Amino acid sequence: MSDAVNVRKAIEELRREINRHNTLYYVDARPEISDYEFDRLMERLIELEKAFPDFVTPDSPSHRVGGAITREFPSVRHREPMLSLSNTYSLAEVEDFYSRVKKLLLVEGVREQDMAAELKFDGVAISLLYRDGLLVQGATRGDGTEGDDITTNLKTLSSVPLRIPLTSLPVIEGIERDIEIRGEVFMQKDDFARLNEARPEEDRFANPRNATAGTLKLQDSGEVARRRLNFVAYYLRLSSQDSFLLTQYDRLELLGQLGFFTGKHYRLCRDMKEIGDFIGYWAVERWNLPYETDGVVLKLNDVALWPRIGATAKSPRWAIAYKYPAQQAKTVLQGVAFQVGRLGTVTPVAELEPVRLAGSTVSRSTLHNFDEIERLGLMLHDRVIIEKSGEVIPKVIRVVLDERPENAEPVGVPSVCPECGASLEKPENEVSYYCPDQDSCPAQIRGRLLHFASRNALDIQSLGESLVAQLVQKGLVRDAGDLYLLQQPQLEALERMGRKSAHNLLRALQESREKSYERLLYALGIRHVGQATARELARAYETVEALQNASEEELATVPDVGPVVAHSVKDYFSKSSTQMLLRKLRDAGFPLRFTGPQKLINRNFEGVNVLFTGALERYGRQQASELVQQRGGRVVGSVSRSTGVVVAGSEPGSKLDKARKLGVKVISEDEFNAML
């Protein structure tokens, strides 16, 4: 057997194995291997395909890594209209729908029929087209007749099979070359939280659905891949006739066999009582799911009857969506606090009489800005209705005016900063008030320090809120540069800071100097500059000097920047406080330049997130980190689903237990040494 044949077989086997593990992870939710082991399989496949490009196929899982830039999304016409479902918030209207369907069926001579009940995902509707089993097109719903072709972006979703196994389809005449799958793209709650944490405060998404819609419109498929979207399938079209697949339940089962995630929480309901039970059960249990669901979809189970019942111009008559009313509770506005963010924005926060809502106790709620207080007509001591819908944080939606107490009083708008006493400013055409004293306001200093130390910035884990508050209150730190001037005795004198804690912080600060230039740019906390923008700026301007000397016009041409961000960047570097901070960071050992990819000794840890816990005998923590980086890896400070391997030394901490719970591979120091 020739070498080429052996290589082809190895590549095909790798693809099968990777696709199998993708299905286990995204569809069945029972992974067999850690992320590290999966990444190694993918890296091996990419390596072989680069060496043997003739063996690359359109359905290779290596295409999921993204990277292609799409300048525009052409329109495509749907083969059948993507109708939206009529929806209701009323169980009585669901019962009316059920009765109406039964009457229509009686006219057709059909007495009893089951309804298929499925969870309604709060996402973005998508159509996938497979030709001879290969994914050839993915499109948004658009206006129902035409949508945007976003195939490149959808190929990055691991829950979208690039090829479906035709052998799993029923052996029935009439199946066409083109098979259509419809469903919903969504973002899990954890991934949504991670995405928002990496964005500037003023650019964060309100809820997972907004984040999903925004992500699918991105022109950079690499960024789409990094945001970890998911796809749930609920519709299958095999032919123009299609009635040989007799039930919707059968379709969902077949979709699962084809490798699609279907939500799994679907069932058949024989009568209105079972429908009501299903809706009632998930009204409570949906909060325990890892993704947002906002209702239940009911469909006549017998697909053959769908055309006989028909549809209106907008929606089918054989289906309805019951949407859960937003969770609401009545409580009392006890006060309004004013928070000052790291950029000086003053945000009013409602202080509420504690009340249970959506499975948790709520005592505070954002009021967004002072215009919102005026719009609501809100007064202190009012009874208010708070609501939790798709938003992460509950919001006040209205005042119960007929229950307004006699002691109600207006909410005063502060004229000075609640933290530093500076006179507040309200820029023209903006709704928020700002504290202009960026250099001295304690709240802004604390906010900037916490951002500088956050996980996606320099990841200084030992630097938490209480410690930052002490450092600022005692005048030890006024900007991030002062952190690197701290001494062990100063730290030991602080509350709850013994010798070991002080040592750990100094070590974490030392290690933070090794973080990349782009992460440092993000850590600076420039308004409107999130992780992606910081990455583009670092690539365009390889030194801080070059970046601060660039004109606004030049900055605006950088991908992901534009005029608003360019002005913000230029304004930031024009301040004397910024220049002082940069001098301190340079003196602390930060190179303040893009060093490019480190020269690798080998690629044994390429693309792997490595975490160390416990004490190592052969190496100090910094030396061990450098060994990983010299082999293409990245050292992280916390355990997550993206951690590839944990190196456990003597006396490991709680991170080891968490790693084992998540199924992350754990190795000893000897095994680590052997991998070098």
Curated annotation (Swiss-Prot):
Family recorded in the similarity comment: Belongs to the NAD-dependent DNA ligase family. LigA subfamily.
Binding-site residues, Zn(2+): C417, C420, C435, C441
SUPFAM superfamilies per the UniProt record, alphabetical: BRCT domain, DNA ligase/mRNA capping enzyme, catalytic domain, Nucleic acid-binding proteins, RuvA domain 2-like
Protein's name according to its UniProt entry: DNA ligase
NCBIfam families found in the cross-reference section: dnlj (TIGR00575), PRK07956.1 (NF005932)
Biological processes annotated in GO: DNA repair; DNA replication
Annotated residues for binding of NAD(+): D35, Y36, E37, F38, D39, S84, L85, E118, R141, E184, K299, K323
Organism of this sequence: Chlorobium phaeobacteroides (strain DSM 266 / SMG 266 / 2430)
Gene Ontology molecular-function annotations: DNA binding; DNA ligase (NAD+) activity; metal ion binding
